[in-house]
Amino acid sequence: MMFFKRTILACTVALLFPALPSYAEVGAENGNSAQAEKPGLWKRFTSNVAETWNNSPNKDLYVPAITWHNRLTYSQEKIDSYNERPWGGGYGISRYDSDGDWHGLYMMVFKDSFNKWEPIGGYAYEKIWRPLEDKDFRLGLGFTASITARDNWNYIPIPAPLPLASIGYKQLTFQATYIPGTYNNGNVFFGWFRWQF
């Protein structure tokens, strides 16, 4: 029962945190026009989260695909004991901005390395490149500002800012991150498919 309560708490926090900037005053008047032209990083971040929350035309289905523990940083005994098939699922909303870059809010639940449920949710951004003539093919590089909770940490919600990379064609995208760490801890490649509808 405690697992369920903490999981619900973690999911609620993960969904509410990115929504908070949508309640902030987005277009406050400021006498300094130079500052209005170039908002700071935090202002830009909260504005993008609010815009994504309020004006995202796309719905996304997330399907976890792989967790891979870096063989150079784990003992064989640990590798043999870990789950590397993170079945689960998730849902999100997303949009492309005027520069063609991708913004998303998401919630996903998957089986972690110990085969226990792990929720994660938050905001994600990717700078998008379309290197081919076929503009449906794209590459992305960015970050996710998320919150997760794990069984081995008693499902206490913790922030998880992580790098993000992707390769996509039309509605299907493979996204991935790398969780840094120390020997026998962290250093995990985590990838999932995202289907936009």
Curated annotation (Swiss-Prot):
EC number: 2.3.1.251
A Pfam family hit: PagP
Record's signal peptide: 1-24
GO cellular component annotations of the record: cell outer membrane
Intrachain disulfide bonds: none
Major location (coarse): membrane
Catalytic activity, reaction form: a lipid A + a 1,2-diacyl-sn-glycero-3-phosphocholine = a hepta-acyl lipid A + a 2-acyl-sn-glycero-3-phosphocholine; a lipid IVA + a 1,2-diacyl-sn-glycero-3-phosphocholine = a lipid IVB + a 2-acyl-sn-glycero-3-phosphocholine; a lipid IIA + a 1,2-diacyl-sn-glycero-3-phosphocholine = a lipid IIB + a 2-acyl-sn-glycero-3-phosphocholine
Annotated active site: H69, D112, S113
Molecular function via GO: acyltransferase activity
Domain of life where this protein originates: Bacteria
Name used for this protein in its record: Lipid A acyltransferase PagP
Gene that encodes the chain: pagP
